[in-house]
């Protein structure tokens, strides 16, 4: 999934597998998705990977993006791990404005600290069609990433 704003901020996210791909107990094996990505802002670009979403949380990303694209004004999307948060911050001449907060293991290397609550925020002005396409891509990549994780058994 790729979100690219008109002002240059960007975020690429994908499910890259499971945290515990070799666990014998399927409840443990399929409990956490590994999320990897790249982010870019005026300050620079960086990569990250962490077990940031439970398998139950992962589908909420595409549902939230679709709700935002429909301008339903969804509430901020937060997760059990505080690495990632999506907020709808209004609109501008380009389209909707998303704010994506990246915290803890998703922070850029020049802004890392050992506590939560001081995220790096990407501002992404993006059209509704691009949000729908990102939601579709997330669903497809999530299924592929999960299948890749199962293949390692």
Where on the chain are the PLM-derived regions?
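Short amphipathic beta-strand/extended segments with alternating polar/hydrophobic composition
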Residues: 14-15, 44-55, 110-126
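Short, well-structured hydrophobic secondary-structure segments
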Residues: 30-73
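Short glycine-rich, low-complexity/disordered patches
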Residues: 67-86, 143-153
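Mixed-charge, glycine-accented linear interaction segment located at domain edges/termini
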Residues: 103-153
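A structural detector for beta-sheet-dominated domains
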Residues: 4-6, 14-16, 40, 56, ...
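Amphipathic protein-protein interaction modules
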Residues: 76-118
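Generic structural signal for well-ordered, non-transmembrane alpha-helical segments
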Residues: 59, 94, 129-132
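N-terminal domain-start interaction segment
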Residues: 1-47
């Amino acid at each position: 999934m790729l979100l690219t704003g008109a002002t240059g901020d960007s975020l690429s996210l994908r499910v890259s597998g499971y945290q515990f791909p070799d666990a014998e107990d399927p409840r443990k094996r399929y409990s956490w998705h590994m999320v990897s990505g790249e982010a870019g802002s005026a300050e620079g670009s960086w990569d990250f990977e962490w077990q940031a979403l439970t398998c139950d949380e992962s589908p909420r990303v595409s549902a939230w993006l679709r709700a935002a694209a429909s301008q339903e004004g969804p509430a901020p999307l937060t997760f059990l791990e505080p690495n990632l948060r999506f907020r709808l911050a209004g609109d501008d001449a380009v389209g909707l404005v998303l704010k994506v907060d990246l915290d803890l293991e998703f922070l850029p290397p020049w802004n890392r600290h050992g506590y939560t609550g001081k995220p790096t925020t990407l501002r992404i002005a993006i059209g509704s069609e691009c949000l729908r396409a990102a939601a579709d891509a997330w669903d497809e990549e999530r299924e592929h990433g999960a299948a890749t994780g199962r293949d390692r058994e």
